[in-house]
């Protein structure tokens, strides 16, 4: 199960730069203007063999009397509840501010480890400013320069050392793990209740810490499966919380623990930006996907044409990955609820597919010979052999070629599309590798 690292602090202390450094991306916009990170940023990282998710809590709150304090207050409170490690970023060039003190007052009550990151120590002299931050009561300030990378390797060592040891609990690997995810009010709780009913038919429950995912094993409708949920759900009245950010953090937890994600879409609202954000999380984590268009009972004029138009719109927004099942359902009336579980089970089986090497070559090589990769720089590319890699999270295939460096992304997509035509790989991502023969 992955860990969650939250980056918190007042605006313009370098949170987005640190996020980019930890995730090795340029995903977060970096600007000197405070409040530049208007959207929530989340990414994946790995260090010393430990994978973890990173959330940059920068952002912007609309129609707030005090934009910065309101945003920081809500996101720090959520970080305190959700994160395994909290990075509190301060700016040594500005010293301790009132906002720093307000954030520190909250973090001193955190149950998770807090690392105070003294950023912008771009030269040795600036390190002499760091001791000022001891008065925040959060231990030693850890000096780094996010923009140059100085000190970030040691910071990563420290972050990983704070993670709890991985649970010794072992799940039955032959039983699929389903997570129901989606934006607020899409019907997640309703469909879970429809799945498991009032009796809940619990076989066994495996839980870790209060922030870990819970795997509850059910047997329902003839299916044996784990339903992935997260512990320690906070009551809505505990804080006037930012629901979008909170659901993203919660989705990270559920997605990481699942084999197949059941993404709930509200039929009365269609695809919105947060649906795309959660879909992106599913893709980043290489999980199986079933899209459920919930509240279908509320749609008027439910003709086949309307259903087809809705389906085409979903696939268009999720492109280029379009090979996944879509179920039009109603958690309230339990319409097609069994089909949701059936499709999730199929996607799980597709993720587990093992295709014999002889069959792969028998089906794919004639296609490749008929439609070879385009010649590059006058050189002809020949693919001689294909095999499936063992023990991978998703189906992964290696095509051996004489000039693998010249096989471009469009041809990889061609190979993937042809494989999806030949075998049922619906709902699961696949990996295509081109290697030297």
From Swiss-Prot:
Report keywords, A-Z: GTP-binding, Nucleotide-binding, Repeat, Ribosome biogenesis
So where does GTP 1 get bound? 9-16, 56-60, 119-122
Question: Where on this chain does GTP 2 bind?
Answer: 182-189, 229-233, 294-297
Per the record's keyword annotation, is GTP-binding included, yes or no?
A: yes
User: What region holds the KH-like domain?
Assistant: 353-437
Q: Write down the InterPro entries for this protein, in alphabetical order.
A: G_ENGA (IPR031166), GTP-bd (IPR006073), GTPase_Der (IPR016484), KH_dom-like (IPR032859), KH_dom-like_a/b (IPR015946), P-loop_NTPase (IPR027417), Small_GTP-bd (IPR005225)
Every EngA-type G domain range: 3-167, 176-352
A single MF term (Gene Ontology): GTP binding
Q: Which GO terms describe its biological process?
A: ribosome biogenesis
Domain of life where this protein originates: Bacteria
The entry's family comment says:
Belongs to the TRAFAC class TrmE-Era-EngA-EngB-Septin-like GTPase superfamily. EngA (Der) GTPase family.
- Functional note: GTPase that plays an essential role in the late steps of ribosome biogenesis.
Q: How does it assemble?
A: Associates with the 50S ribosomal subunit.
Q: What is this protein called?
A: GTPase Der
Q: Species name for this entry?
A: Bacteroides fragilis (strain ATCC 25285 / DSM 2151 / CCUG 4856 / JCM 11019 / LMG 10263 / NCTC 9343 / Onslow / VPI 2553 / EN-2)
Q: What is the lineage of its organism?
A: Bacteria, Pseudomonadati, Bacteroidota, Bacteroidia, Bacteroidales
């Amino acid at each position: 199960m992955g860990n969650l690292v939250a980056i918190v602090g007042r605006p313009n202390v370098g949170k987005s730069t640190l996020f980019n450094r930890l995730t090795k991306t340029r995903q977060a916009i970096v600007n000197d203007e405070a409040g530049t990170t208007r959207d929530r940023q989340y990414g994946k990282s790995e260090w010393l063999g430990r994978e973890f998710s990173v959330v940059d809590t920068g952002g912007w709150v609309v129609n707030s009397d005090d934009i910065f304090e309101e945003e920081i207050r809500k996101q720090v409170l959520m970080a305190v509840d959700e994160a395994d490690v909290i990075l509190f970023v301060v700016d040594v060039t500005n010293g301790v501010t009132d906002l720093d003190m307000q954030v520190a007052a909250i973090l001193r009550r955190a149950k998770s480890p807090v690392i105070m990151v003294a950023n912008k120590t771009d030269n040795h002299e600036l390190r002499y400013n760091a001791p000022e931050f001891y008065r925040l009561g959060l231990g030693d300030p850890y000096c780094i320069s996010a923009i140059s990378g100085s000190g970030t390797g040691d910071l990563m060592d420290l972050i990983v050392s704070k993670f709890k040891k991985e649970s010794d609990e072992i799940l039955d690997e032959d039983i699929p793990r389903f997570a129901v995810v989606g934006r607020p009010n899409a019907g997640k709780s309703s469909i879970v209740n429809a799945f498991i009913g009032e009796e809940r038919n619990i076989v066994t429950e495996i839980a870790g810490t209060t922030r870990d995912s819970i795997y509850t094993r059910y047997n329902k409708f003839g299916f044996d499966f784990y339903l992935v949920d997260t512990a320690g759900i906070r009551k809505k009245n505990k804080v006037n919380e930012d629901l979008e950010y909170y659901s993203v953090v919660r989705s990270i937890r559920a997605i990481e623990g699942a084999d197949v994600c059941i993404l709930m879409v509200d039929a009365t609202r269609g695809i919105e930006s947060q649906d795309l954000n959660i879909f992106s999380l599913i893709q980043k984590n290489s999980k199986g996907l079933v899209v459920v268009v919930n509240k279908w009972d509320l749609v008027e004029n439910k003709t086949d044409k309307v259903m087809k138009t809705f389906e085409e719109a979903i696939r268009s927004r999720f492109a280029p990955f379009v090979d996944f099942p879509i179920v039009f359902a109603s958690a309230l009336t339990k319409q097609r609820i069994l089909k949701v579980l059936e499709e999730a089970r199929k996607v799980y089986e597709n993720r587990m597919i093992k295709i014999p090497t002889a069959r792969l070559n028998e089906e794919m090589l004639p296609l490749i010979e008929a439609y070879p990769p385009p010649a590059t720089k006058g050189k002809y590319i020949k693919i001689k052999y294909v095999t499936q890699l063992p023990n991978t999270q998703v189906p992964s295939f290696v095509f051996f070629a004489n000039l693998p460096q010249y096989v471009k992304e469009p041809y990889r997509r061609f190979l993937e599309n042809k494989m999806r035509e030949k075998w049922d790989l619906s709902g699961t991502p696949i990996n295509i590798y081109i290697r030297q023969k």
